[in-house]
Amino acid sequence: MYSKLKTEINESIKEALTKLRIKYDDEIILEEPPNPSMGDMSTNIAFSLASKLKKSPVEIAQEIKENIKLPLYFEKVETKGPYINFYINYTLFTTKVVNYIDKNYGELPEKDERILLEHTSANPNGPLHVGHLRNAILGDSLKRILQHAGYKVEAQYYVNDMGRQIAIIVWGMDKFNYTVDDDKKADHAIGEVYYKCNQQLEANPEYNQEIDDILRKYEEGTDAALIDAFQGVVEYCIDGIKETLKDLNIKMNLFKWESTFLRNGSVDDVLEKLQPFTIQKDILYLPLERYNVDKELVLRRSNGTSLYATRDLAYHQYKTKNSDISLDILGADHKLAAKQLGLALELSNNRAPEVVFYEFIDLPEGSMSTRKGVFISVDEFIEQSVEHAKEELIRRDLDLTEKQIEEVSKIVGVGSIRFYINQISPEKPITFKWEEALSFERGCASIQYAHARACKLLAKSDYNEFEEVRCDYELDDEEKDLIKTLSQFTEVICQSAQERRVHHLAQYTLSLSKAFNKFYKSKQVIGSEHEKLRLKLVDASRITLKNSLKLLGIKSPEFM
């Protein structure tokens, strides 16, 4: 709705320019003035026209203003020096906004484009650790936003079953009779076996040749028992990883195995397409100097086996055939590999993926011990967050039963992790701070609390969600701010989807909760002479907060 207001202003300015016989092809920039007394939207187009028209910006602004036909939802237009300021008619606009918002608010029309979004894709040799967390959360949140924006999105986890790590586990289980501990979560049990195997390799480096032999045999695909062993290890570990993803409210559409592309001939197919550009010496490689990439892309080892990059090319060829847009979520340390991959794909008449790169998460010293280099698993991290959330809920002495505290602790604990990561632009590194993540003033809990407040207020009232209301009074600043913020939801979804950036929506959601809390604290709702309209405003806030959190993969408790 807010974007519609912008469109109407743009059209009214263009009409005024036409009347004045002024040609202007550039984009008309609209901004929100720093002070509400200066209007709701403002443009400095007069500055841009000054040199062309050889007039002062103040004079130009006045001429444009005098020729503007005021759009429907605006009450006046004024000039302040060279700026043209527009003032929303909040009586009309509020009636429109509160009656428009329903449970589907923010959904955009269906688009034809199919997006194949790959994220997480951690090696199945142990549990997800904090290093994987940002990838998983950004990927899942982006999937939700893109779907809400009308795209058909499939989220895939690329299962690296052909990696050396899996061969090491299979080797150790066979050579030393290592077994998984059935009492432990599957991925953690596999991780322990992997650790034991690596200890053996460190003590006996000559064993590495045996690993090479196992990898070669698995790639040949003729040893059925070996294939079963690899698949058994990977499936067992992935089962544990799926549990962790579920705890984070993440659901994949498909787990696509790396070996699929070797077995079905896709690897040979992509190598054949690249043959005119490759060089065969001891190894097969693709030189990339002519594309300003110093490091060549190795495609086949001297023993004839393929590499991860080769199979990844085949996977991305599959993406090209099965989607209109390929979208990868990758750590910033993958920039060179992504560049090499993209060039190789284009040379083989395939499509290079769009890539969202992200920086990494640091844990502040002392918050969670890394136990001398041992990684922090996502399971441990979630457990810590839920425990912190529980302590905070108890400290606040909220009106909750013991069962409700347990339930809300899990919702707030997981939500706080997701929101803290989502609110920061992926280009920026994160230092995770519990006191900020779990803050009831500026963290996810503050948003969830605002939602619970709205639910409680509506439950105490005689609110009828199906009754349309009219605004028939002059709104205060808190109400105007809330109405304006509510109206911006769809525009923010568009921005997040187009830019592939989740933090726009996260930051908007926090702003909305702050606007609602200001309104809640300053205005009587039940029993006021404007009760029906204000209840409608409360419900519109509840819906928009809930929808916003859902797109960020966060649950909205109805009580806190």
From Swiss-Prot:
Transmembrane segments: none annotated. It comes from the Archaea. The keyword Cell division does not apply. Its EC number is 6.1.1.19. It holds the Pfam family DALR_1. CDD domains: ArgRS_core. GO terms for molecular function: arginine-tRNA ligase activity; ATP binding. It is found in: Cytoplasm. It catalyses: tRNA(Arg) + L-arginine + ATP = L-arginyl-tRNA(Arg) + AMP + diphosphate. The keyword Cytoplasm applies. InterPro entries: aa-tRNA-synth_I_CS, Arg-tRNA-ligase, Arg-tRNA-synth_N, Arg-tRNA-synth_N_sf, ArgRS_core, DALR_anticod-bd, Rossmann-like_a/b/a_fold, tRNAsynth_Ia_anticodon-bd. A motif ('HIGH' region) lies at residues 122-132. GO terms for biological process: arginyl-tRNA aminoacylation. Belongs to the class-I aminoacyl-tRNA synthetase family. This is Arginine--tRNA ligase.
